[in-house]
Amino acid sequence: MAESVYKIIELVGTSDQSWEKAAAAAVQRASESLRDLRVAEVTQMDLVLENGQVTAYRSKVKVSFKYEGG
């Protein structure tokens, strides 16, 4: 197997429905501009509150992809 190098970036996805959908939104957005995504790791979840009510779910996600730079 050839040696490979992967780059890791950190993103925050949001959803008004769930943490899972927030994480999926982050990965989906990353896939629009990055190739060869490999692993996504949810590292933190939080809520946005307004007047004591949940208005958004946020998932912080580390996404790795194969590094092809020079």
Predicted features along the sequence, with ranges:
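Short, conserved loop-to-beta-strand elements that form functional interface hotspots
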Residues: 40-48
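C-terminal structural segments of small proteins and small subunits
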Residues: 51-70
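Short connector loops at helix/strand junctions that flank enzyme active sites
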Residues: 6, 37-40, 54-60
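Flexible glycine-/small-residue-rich
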Residues: 13-15, 44, 65-67
